[in-house]
């Protein structure tokens, strides 16, 4: 689910459009004619507007009827906790006091899923003020202070890129990028992410996979590799969604022979967070070596296991990096025992950082730890590239 908060005169397809109740703001279910009038897409945000010119905006926005899907605002977003993939807000935060902005960001953190996107678009107060100083044009005064046609028309909080980043990052979000300015006046839109577990493909530095290479993803799980030509798993439920999208799927146990695959059929084999679950990693390594020419194996480090509830993971092995960086990682049978980092109490149960509900830790600690995890996740895994043959060492 995607939320478009403060939708105003823009009805975005693919989003749940949210705005405050007002005399000329109607619900979409009651006014499908207004939906048709104002609907557009994110990449054509102002396509239905004739008033977005400097001369017309001098008099304020046109007095027309608008539409949204549900009434609401940032004080109480109409969405369950951890249910939202993206929140887009254009020219709303400047209408909030800084205290209200902090509450709004708390709400965003509450409803966004881990790795959810937050996009905030506001006027560029620094650049606008400079233009007003240079020209004296009242249009830039309006851009600074707001249209001031009613109580909600005032700009209460000016922002620069630095100040917006500071307030959003204070709530644990991670800055991703600045998006292109879609306005004809100074403004900026910053994109943030709510930290969480990421797909390893998003942080592991892979060598370039040449076009034309045939790629196999073993154990795709929640994050199937988009570059893969085929996906292998013993669990049919993990493969069904991929099969329905026309992907080649191979139901097989990688510890077996996998007769569906020919010798050295795949130019590159991607295997992330699978080997630690297997009873016989040596057998799996032999099969992978037979069907693949090269690849990467990603497994959690022993330190990472120590930060989480190891007993809940179903991992059968702890994996230690080999002192010789070019040599295979060492698999040590876990037997349910993992050395914990006991001197940092809050890290004994790192999985709670990514969990919603009454059992989660204090929000401030949750945010800081979640952000730390996100920014350092690549350091918490053992990444092993192999060529011709995948070797592993096993210590019982």
Predicted regions span which residues?
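Core dinuclear metal-dependent hydrolase active-site scaffold
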Residues: 4-8, 206-208, 218-220, 235, ...
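Short, solvent-exposed coil/turn segments at beta-strand boundaries
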Residues: 1, 214, 323-325
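Conserved alpha-helix/loop element of class I SAM-dependent methyltransferases that forms part
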Residues: 198-213
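Conserved SAM-binding loop
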Residues: 3-130, 164, 190-195, 211-304
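S-adenosyl-L-methionine-dependent methyltransferase catalytic module, highlighting the catalytic core
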Residues: 60-62, 97-113, 117-198, 259, ...
